[in-house]
Design a protein with these regions (language model features):
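N-terminal hydrophobic/helix-forming segments and targeting peptides
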Residues: 1-111
């Protein structure tokens, strides 16, 4: 089965948007932009998005698609004299999962 190009672009945009725990703004923004064409979009104080499809009328079945917008995240605590970074963990996850993984480092301006 060939995946629809629109769905592939959405998945790529969501995967590429930085979204460490507590800093999911860019992921929510991407989801909101894509969902705007589907129907009404509401957001609560926890940054949860609720998308109500325009076509959901009458006695049609309703389904829920649920997912997290956050990902594994770290904050740079300090930089050692040799250039190595010391991190503080955001959220709760297994630290061993990070060993030899690539990370994206951004400054306070998001650059």
């Amino acid at each position: 089965m060939k995946m629809n190009e629109h769905a592939l672009h959405l998945l790529k945009a969501l995967a590429d948007a930085p979204g460490a725990s507590g800093f999911e703004d860019e992921v929510v923004k991407v989801a909101r932009q894509y969902a705007a064409s589907i129907g009404e979009v509401k957001e609560d104080f926890l940054r949860n998005l609720y998308i109500y499809r325009k076509e959901n009328t009458g006695n049609k079945p309703v389904i829920l698609i649920d997912g997290h917008s956050d990902e594994v995240g770290l904050i740079v605590h300090s930089i050692k004299p040799n250039g190595c970074l010391r991190f503080l963990q955001l959220g709760n996850w297994n630290k061993n999962a990070l060993i030899s993984s690539k990370v994206l480092v951004r400054n306070a301006k998001g650059e």
